[in-house]
């Protein structure tokens, strides 16, 4: 009798635990129709406490790796504010790389011999399970000291071979899938002293091969006066980008734009915090104060080809999930579908 009672209690406990456990996230696997996949997040490099990765950054990084395991991506894009509060400093390079880059994004990094020797213990995922991707980064407004720029450009790749800082101040990466990624330093181009660099942005967009054009910068175009020179430079190119990937605002957003500005702005600024400004972007369709990340897929070919844009919310109280999704056609037509919300 006692044995039966113990078995019954154990069974009920297992059922209770099973009922309390949140459902597993379900995302479709990457199908053959997906020609290119990019993951994106920004504003992630919060200062470690006692050398430990901040909990919010770690949660987002783990969700990012889980999404890549389900549907492998082709590149991970960091949209700035990589190292708070004043960028990367020479006296703490290895500590910051250990806690802010190699540890949380272990799934994606490729360590050099030097990186493996000095930081390898921070990368806990077995090497056989990792999926190193190109790590393409732009500067944020917290990264702009001369020391940090030099360290992010030259020192980080000595430890992490697949890290590359782009957009100093403008740089284009042409991908074989017909996607032109135009990276630019929005903090620098906001400054009147750097006005002479704005034609570089015009030229880069005008000369991009396309037909798909994605701008990558830290700041979204949020209607401020400081954005006007950048908007004029984009308009002068004579070709329109379908997408601007940005961060800076510490939340998740989507906004449609009017020609000749980018057809859509996808804000993925929740890599390490969710201190949303709650201000509204021009053409805003969605806003969620949550940590998380974004995914961009190029789907299909010919007349049916489109960009599929998704925002993933990550929190301490819920499983990571898609909360908003849109498609953007080659001509810039936007179709939206809001899937839900999540609390941080």
Language-model segment annotations:
Residues 19-96, 195, 218, 224:
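N-terminal active-site segment of His-dependent metallophosphoesterases
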Residues 25, 49-51, 85-212, 229-243, ...:
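Extended active-site neighborhood of metal-dependent phosphoesterases/phosphodiesterases
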Residues 208-224:
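Short acidic, glycine-rich surface-loop motifs adjacent to enzyme active sites
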Residues 285-344:
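A short C-terminal boundary segment appended to hydrolase-like catalytic domains
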